[in-house]
Amino acid sequence: MAEIVWSNPALDQLEEIADYIALDKPQSAAELVKKIFSTVERLGQFPNSGHALPEIPDSIYREVCVRPCRIFYRQENDVVLIIHVMREEMQLRKFLLDVDLIS
C-alpha cells in the first residue's frame, strides 16, 4: 500500500477552496473536504485509479475529481504525492506541474 503525502501548497489550496465555500455553506465545505480526503486515501491502495490529465496526456501526473475540485498527484515508488488542488472550472497551466511544489 502506498503512503499518501500532501504537499503544503496542495493543503493550502484545499483550505482556500473550503474557506470560500464555507462563507455561504459551512456544512457543504466540511463535506467536500471529508470526501476529498476519503477519495485521496483510496489512492493508497489503487494509485493508478486516477485519470491521465487531458491537458498533458503523456505526463507522469494523474488526477482524481471530487466536484467541484480536481486533485493532482504523482506516484513515486511507494508514495502518492498530492501536489495541486483546484476548482474544475479553472484552466490548468502546464507550468504549474513543472514546478517542484513540495515544501
Q: Which residues are covered by each model-predicted region?
A:
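Short acidic-hydrophobic surface loop/beta-edge motif
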Residues: 62-64
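Basic, Lys/Arg-enriched alpha-helical interface segments
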Residues: 2-60, 101-103
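Enriched for short, Lys/Arg-rich terminal
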Residues: 66-69, 74-103
